[in-house]
A protein has these predicted regions:
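Proteolytic processing junctions in secreted/extracellular precursors
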Residues: 3-12
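Core nucleotide-handling region used for phosphoryl-transfer chemistry
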Residues: 11-60, 65-393
Length: 393
């Protein structure tokens, strides 16, 4: 089958770009999607444990997760309108298409002034740090002088704030001077090589490329991780208990079939309100959620179909509540094991002061890249942690 030259150019551009992937919570959600994904997640968690110990592991790099917005993609890709490689920017990956000029931005994002403005700034200044040889990178917009989200503060500090967390550094430090003189601040985290992704990229070559662009320092101070024998024992205790609870599941895949998305939504609810996950709590959440599906349809036949589905799902939870109990126990112990590692990463010392509503805060989390190309995020999923505060903001 033949294709037009323009279609070929669109496909060529797509081959070097890709939608910004959702990062899964390490030890937080994969067990709701079956035995195989749970086992892979356990393996990733154990290798982060080895990384923290300084042992050989499959972890390639750990970076600090930046609380910026919007997520973008930029680089030199083929412009279908000209047939040449040009610098362009895309919102949340290339799925919405690249903008190569202001006309493109107007057409794609003219109805969203805030987003249009930020992507326009990335388009204007991003090219100053990206050569055609740098390929395509993904990142987050951390602030700008134009939007007044890069600003000086008392105490001789320079700060950025786009989302929940405010980042602050001494104005007379090397990075502080760069931020003070910049027009925009960007956090770069991923480089694309065809359909391959390189996470937690080395951003050193971008940092001094242009005074107009400040590159957010998202490097982990690995040498400062103080992972003591006591911490290691606490991790191992909860890791072992989680595996024991998984071992009590008679049919892991069958248990979560049809429930995966609801379980994940329920866990977010418990993060938001600080409650402990339980079969009873899940059943209540599920009933309330499915009742909405029943209520919003009009015809008797459709309403009865939705009602039958709800009754079946709730019966399933009640009939297997002992198995859901083991699943939630495993979830709880995995979260505790993960939090031991998270605490050590958080205490390794950050490159910026983090505050939320002028109160000292910890980082949003960390991004862990593995040598097989997989990636996970490590985040405090308590009501008091970043996830809880972000869900409740």
């Amino acid at each position: 089958m033949s294709i037009t030259f323009t279609s070929f150019l669109f496909e060529a551009a797509a081959a070097t770009t890709g939608a910004i992937k959702h990062l899964t919570h390490l030890a937080g959600e994969e067990h709701f999607y079956g035995k195989e994904r749970a086992a892979a997640d356990l393996d990733r968690l154990e290798h982060l444990h080895r990384f923290a110990k300084g042992e050989k592991s499959y972890v390639s790099r750990v970076g600090i997760k930046a609380d910026g917005s919007p997520a973008f993609e930029m680089g030199h890709v083929v412009n279908p309108a000209t047939g040449h490689k040009e610098f362009g920017v895309a919102y949340k990956g290339a799925s919405k298409g690249y903008a190569f000029n202001q006309k493109d931005l107007d057409e794609k994002f003219g109805d969203k002034p805030g987003l249009h403005s930020k992507l326009s700034q990335v388009l204007e200044h991003g090219k100053k740090v990206m050569s055609p040889l740098d390929g395509v990178v993904q990142g987050d917009f951390m602030g700008s002088k134009k939007d007044k989200t890069v600003f000086p503060e008392k105490g001789n500090r320079m700060s950025t704030k786009e989302q929940l967390i405010k980042y602050s550094i001494p104005a007379d430090s090397e990075e502080g001077k760069k931020l003070k003189n910049s027009k925009i601040s960007l956090a770069l985290h991923t480089r694309l090589h065809g359909d391959q992704r390189e996470y937690n990229i080395d951003t050193k070559k971008f940092e001094d490329a242009s005074p107009d662009v400040h590159i957010f320092n998202n490097k982990l101070n690995k040498e400062n991780i103080n992972y003591t024998p006591e911490h290691q024992a606490e991790f191992q205790k909860n890791f072992k208990k989680a595996k024991e609870e998984f071992g009590k599941l008679r049919d892991h895949d069958g248990l979560v079939e049809g429930h995966s998305e609801h379980l994940q939504t329920y866990i977010n609810k418990t993060v938001r309100d600080g409650s402990t996950p339980s079969p009873a709590g899940y059943k209540k959440h599920l009933g309330e959620r499915l009742q909405k599906d029943v209520d919003k349809v009009k015809t008797f036949a459709t309403k009865q179909k939705k009602q039958d589905h709800m009754d079946s799902m709730l019966h399933d939870v009640e009939e297997h509540k002992d198995q859901f109990h083991h699943l939630f126990n495993a979830h709880r112990h995995l979260d505790k094991a993960k939090n031991v590692l998270l605490d050590r990463l958080e205490m390794s010392g950050q490159n910026q002061e983090h505050t939320i509503n002028d109160k000292q805060a910890k980082p949003e989390g960390f991004v862990v890249g593995y040598k097989d190309g997989s990636v996970s995020k490590v985040v405090n999923r308590s009501k008091e942690g970043f996830s809880g505060q972000n869900l409740n903001k």
